[in-house]
From Swiss-Prot:
Catalyzes the formation of 4-diphosphocytidyl-2-C-methyl-D-erythritol from CTP and 2-C-methyl-D-erythritol 4-phosphate (MEP). One of its GO terms (biological process) is isopentenyl diphosphate biosynthetic process, methylerythritol 4-phosphate pathway involved in terpenoid biosynthetic process. HAMAP family: IspD (MF_00108). Its EC number is 2.7.7.60. Was identified as a high-confidence drug target. The gene is ispD. Pathway: Isoprenoid biosynthesis; isopentenyl diphosphate biosynthesis via DXP pathway; isopentenyl diphosphate from 1-deoxy-D-xylulose 5-phosphate: step 2/6. This is 2-C-methyl-D-erythritol 4-phosphate cytidylyltransferase. It comes from the Bacteria. PROSITE patterns: ISPD. It is an enzyme of class 2 (transferase).
Amino acid sequence: MVREAGEVVAIVPAAGSGERLAVGVPKAFYQLDGQTLIERAVDGLLDSGVVDTVVVAVPADRTDEARQILGHRAMIVAGGSNRTDTVNLALTVLSGTAEPEFVLVHDAARALTPPALVARVVEALRDGYAAVVPVLPLSDTIKAVDANGVVLGTPERAGLRAVQTPQGFTTDLLLRSYQRGSLDLPAAEYTDDASLVEHIGGQVQVVDGDPLAFKITTKLDLLLAQAIVRG
């Protein structure tokens, strides 16, 4: 597939089971006020006006359902056994004579992410940063603890941030990070894509996140999302 220079492709890993949410279906397929989380996430990306193509990775037995839900809005691929493998599989569709300039990776569970946040990440990429993540300052005090629950220390909160998605990268950097990082450590040890970039020595730039880009993981998160959607 030939792609134009400067194109932005967004990958949405949505192959997880969402066991903590316990809604009886994979989390991405849960309907929030009549619309699935995956549909809301994809629409937010496209509504930003800065994303050209969306690739969604879903459980292998849900590909037909995903195509029916999303139609022409996204390419559908089967995901893997964990998040890192799923993104890796989605990256394979980017092979061709011309790769996109930038790749975003966005959690389907962050279904209410404002389009303006997506645009902010891409703007930073176009400004010359090779890896960009949206973040929010922490309001809670954080404790480091050992396996026995003993507090080891209290990190300085002023220097800590909660990371959101979409996370954006130059395509070459993300591909190199996955190729090398996945060989060095088990996939389960990487909780986000920026961690892979950090692992190979890449620099990651932060931009302002948005409270609406919270991850719907628990029943409490779901209640909050429902309240927001219903106004």
